[in-house]
């Protein structure tokens, strides 16, 4: 038995309150799976209600004054919101024909609200839709009342009074809500409001007490303006639309968060369909006065301007607000989880920095300044960065030690810890590598690849230029940051970097040195290499095809695949999987074969160029060589999986492979038997990932057949697959490995960060001159040095001296 000073019973027959209770409802129901994305909130503690026994196992609740909550100013803190108001716009829950509700969308919204309610939060819905629901019913009644002649004419011009539609639609709308929430064991209550309920102090207190009682009973109030008796909207903020109602109500019940669902993604700098309009992820009233609003939605009474006004009023009363697209999947739960969706209204304090679009734009602009420098000037910047790495070695290692300590306490895999660790030896290797890149920078940009004499006095050149703006995402390895930054600096590209969170302090320290190098020699280009901090920013950047030209993920196959799936119109340079093969031919040198297979599989098992499948000629599968091969694998601790043909051939075969196209990334591999080189090639084409394949044979004809017909980025003869690496190819620091078919393929060095453009120089030439015979086409290929030589990236050209 619980005791309390005061019991509060809900007036069930109030003309404005309807309690809709499922037949079997738990008072407070929690679901562990629903708590994962959010912060757990104790239902009773959060409400401030104490259960009091009233007999027969039933309870009523006493209410207490809720503690004053601090204003939420960052998305990370949104998950702490305990009392959440969700406003459903007409455009979200109404069908396109404005007649009836979008049932699938409404069911999804109910599911999300139920999930949050069951996680311990107090949810309240401000819902539109009664007019649309009633319009559908009244339209049917109008049709039934029409004469035959009117029916044949069609329904054009048939209208129903909005108040009548609201009166007719309210019962059906609430019945629908009841049925949907009943599937989750949740009780709902209808609260209809008119203007006096808000304006009159006593009625407003009664309203507040009623809602507090409903929330304390774990009931979701569904609130709407009583449009059946509503007067014409007023100019002042009362309840002229449901946005204002939601904002006012959120302030009255001291909600921490108001989510307004609309049919647009949030607040834009101008009308969303206007060219140049940009979505504002954060709206600070004191800093966003220049927003231009478009027309209202055809569905409801409140346009974006009314939403912004309502949100600002809510913010002034201590309620953080998010406007987001209710048509998007999981919009409500994503907003509460703090994901970067929609527009968040907050004060200057706690402001999360400039929008990522502005960051990307500044980076691109600084990159263009970088590209305008001479090759020599960019090379000097890279050399300065190399020197800084040595000079600031102690600073780098101290920051790295912080990351290592955090990673160890978090239980990071030892192999990943090794990648994360920065040592004096690694820094010396970086120093040497960056100086090599600086040397190559002097011939990179502006190099003439082709020179054609089109006609007398008309010359065409193809020259190398930077791609533009790059985004590189890498995991665990902080030494990747200065490598990629130096490649971008040398090639004149802007660069957005996102490293793994486990290397956060190391990346900050290294990025500071990169920025110092970019600010030397009288140049101020620090924004040309920008470090992106949050995962949400990466998701936003993947949509900016006008600001980013190439994405390069460096990490696991899951990372690469994720970038390829989420990128919207931006090319991704990389490979999703590294299913590499080694084919051992019947004419192989057996000792050489065992050594190559050992190196391919065991040298670095998690590398993308490690062998994952070993194909063996059928003649070797029953020879002593097979036992020697298996003994080597056993000594190296490699777990074997048998392909179907090998399993059928052996009496006691290894366990079967789950897939013939699988990247283990560890000391495991698949063994399979093939009849000949043709079958080996067919197997690789079917199951391979297009990365690297190797044949071991002393038969030159067999080797050439393999090299010609294997359709992968790299094909080797009598060599380990581990040679598929930019450094081993002599490309300098490696940008990545690509299995794509355009721009770059295989290991990609700094050349992969360049593209070309055509320069045509004439003397007033016209196409018409070639039609009337004044000029004729020569198309004579020239050695570029014979006529012109590109001296720098600024496009300055000079006649070559004899």
UniProtKB/Swiss-Prot annotation:
Domain of life: Eukaryota
Region entry Gamma-glutamyl phosphate reductase, spans: 355-802
Enzyme Commission code(s) on record: 2.7.2.11, 1.2.1.41
InterPro entries: AceGlu_kinase-like_sf, Ald_DH/histidinol_DH, Ald_DH_C, Ald_DH_N, Aldehyde_DH_dom, Asp/Glu/Uridylate_kinase, G-glutamylP_reductase_CS, G5K_ProBA
UniProt KW keywords: Amino-acid biosynthesis, ATP-binding, Kinase, Multifunctional enzyme, NADP, Nucleotide-binding, Oxidoreductase, Proline biosynthesis, Transferase
Record-listed ATP binding positions: 262-263, 301-307
Region spans: Glutamate 5-kinase: 1-354
Catalysed reaction, written as an equation: L-glutamate + ATP = L-glutamyl 5-phosphate + ADP; L-glutamate 5-semialdehyde + phosphate + NADP(+) = L-glutamyl 5-phosphate + NADPH + H(+)
CDD domains given in the database record: AAK_P5CS_ProBA, ALDH_F18-19_ProA-GPR
Residues noted as binding substrate in the record, renumbered to the chain: 128, 227, 242
Pathway assigned in UniProt: Amino-acid biosynthesis; L-proline biosynthesis; L-glutamate 5-semialdehyde from L-glutamate: step 1/2; Amino-acid biosynthesis; L-proline biosynthesis; L-glutamate 5-semialdehyde from L-glutamate: step 2/2
Cellular component, GO annotation: mitochondrion
SUPFAM superfamilies per UniProt: ALDH-like, Carbamate kinase-like
GO BP, sorted A to Z: L-proline biosynthetic process
Gene Ontology molecular function: any one: glutamate 5-kinase activity
Similarity annotation: In the N-terminal section; belongs to the glutamate 5-kinase family. In the C-terminal section; belongs to the gamma-glutamyl phosphate reductase family.
HAMAP family linked: ProA, ProB
Protein's name according to its UniProt entry: Probable delta-1-pyrroline-5-carboxylate synthase
Biological source species: Caenorhabditis elegans
Record gene name: alh-13
């Amino acid at each position: 038995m619980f005791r309390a000073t005061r019991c509060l019973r809900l007036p069930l027959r109030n003309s404005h309150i309807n309690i809709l209770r499922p037949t079997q409802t738990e008072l407070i129901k929690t679901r562990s799976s629903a708590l994962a994305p959010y912060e757990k909130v104790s239902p009773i503690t959060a409400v401030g209600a104490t259960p009091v026994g009233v007999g027969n196992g039933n309870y009523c609740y006493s209410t207490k004054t809720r503690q004053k909550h601090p204003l939420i100013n960052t998305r990370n803190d949104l998950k702490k919101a305990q009392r959440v108001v969700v406003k459903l716009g007409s455009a979200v829950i109404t069908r396109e024909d404005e007649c009836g509700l979008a049932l699938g969308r409404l069911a999804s919204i109910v599911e999300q609200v139920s999930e949050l309610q069951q996680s311990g939060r107090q949810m309240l819905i401000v819902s539109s839709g009664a007019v649309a629901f009633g319009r559908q019913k009244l339209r049917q009644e109008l049709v039934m009342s029409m004469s035959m002649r009117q029916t044949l004419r069609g329904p054009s011009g048939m209208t129903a009074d909005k108040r009548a539609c609201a009166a007719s639609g309210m019962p059906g709308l609430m019945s629908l809500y009841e049925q949907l929430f009943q599937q989750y064991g949740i009780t709902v209550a209808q609260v209809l409001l008119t203007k006096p309920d808000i304006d009159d102090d006593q009625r407003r207190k009664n309203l507040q007490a009623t809602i507090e009682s409903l929330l304390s009973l774990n009931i979701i109030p569904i609130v709407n303006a009583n449009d059946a008796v509503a007067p014409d909207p007023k100019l002042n903020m009362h309840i002229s639309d449901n946005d204002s109602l939601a904002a006012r109500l959120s302030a009255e019940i001291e909600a921490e968060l108001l989510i307004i669902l609309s049919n647009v993604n949030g607040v834009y700098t101008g009308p969303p369909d206007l060219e140049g309009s940009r979505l504002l992820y954060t709206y600070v009233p004191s800093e966003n006065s220049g927003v231009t609003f478009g027309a209202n939605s055809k569905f409801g009474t409140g346009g974006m301007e009314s939403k912004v006004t309502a949100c600002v009023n809510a913010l002034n009363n201590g309620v953080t607000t998010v406007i987001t697209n209710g048509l998007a999947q999981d919009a409500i739960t994503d907003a509460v989880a703090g994901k970067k969706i929609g527009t968040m209204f907050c004060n200057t304090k706690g402001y999360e920095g400039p929008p990522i679009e502005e960051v990307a734009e500044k980076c691109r602009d600084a990159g263009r300044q970088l590209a305008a420098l001479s090759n020599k000037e960019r090379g000097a910047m890279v050399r300065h960065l190399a020197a800084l790495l040595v000079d600031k070695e102690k600073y780098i290692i101290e920051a790295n030690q912080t990351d290592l300590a955090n990673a160890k306490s978090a239980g990071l895999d030892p192999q990943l810890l090794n990648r994360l660790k920065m040592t004096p030896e690694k820094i010396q290797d970086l120093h040497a590598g960056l100086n090599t890149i600086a040397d190559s920078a002097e011939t990179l940009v502006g190099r003439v690849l082709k020179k054609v004499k089109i006609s007398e006095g008309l010359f065409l050149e193809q020259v190398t230029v930077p791609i533009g703006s790059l985004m590189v995402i890498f995991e665990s390895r902080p030494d990747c940051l200065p490598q990629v930054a130096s490649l971008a600096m040398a090639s004149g590209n802007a660069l957005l970097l996102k490293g793994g969170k486990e290397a956060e302090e190391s990346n900050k320290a290294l990025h500071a040195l990169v920025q110092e190098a970019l600010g030397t020699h009288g140049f101020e280009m620090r924004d040309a290499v920008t470090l992106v901090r949050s995962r949400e920013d990466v998701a936003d950047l993947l949509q900016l095809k006008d600001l980013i030209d190439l994405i390069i993920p460096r990490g696991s196959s899951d990372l690469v695949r994720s970038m390829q799936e989420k990128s919207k119109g931006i090319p991704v340079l990389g490979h999703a999987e590294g299913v590499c093969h080694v084919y051992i031919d019947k004419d192989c040198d057996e000792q050489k074969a065992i050594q190559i297979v050992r190196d391919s599989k065991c040298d670095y098992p998690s590398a993308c160029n490690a062998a994952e499948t070993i194909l063996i000629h059928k003649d070797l599968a029953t020879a002593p060589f097979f036992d020697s091969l298996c003994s080597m694998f056993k000594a190296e601790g490699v777990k074997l999986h048998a392909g179907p043909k090998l399993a059928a051939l052996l009496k006691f075969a290894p366990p079967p492979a789950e897939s013939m196209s699988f990247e283990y990334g560890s000391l495991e591999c698949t063994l399979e038997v093939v009849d000949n080189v043709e079958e080996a090639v067919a197997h690789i084409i079917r199951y391979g990932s297009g990365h690297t394949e190797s044949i071991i044979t002393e038969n030159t004809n067999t080797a050439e057949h393999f090299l010609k017909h294997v359709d992968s980025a790299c094909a080797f003869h009598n060599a380990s697959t581990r040679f598929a690496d930019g450094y081993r190819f002599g490309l300098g620091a490696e940008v990545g490995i690509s299995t794509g078919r355009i721009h770059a393929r295989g290991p990609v060095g700094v050349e992969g960060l360049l593209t070309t453009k055509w320069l045509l120089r004439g003397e007033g030439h016209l196409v018409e001159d070639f039609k009337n015979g004044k000029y004729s086409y020569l198309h004579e290929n020239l050695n570029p040095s014979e006529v012109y030589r590109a001296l720098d990236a600024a496009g300055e050209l000079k006649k070559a001296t004899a």
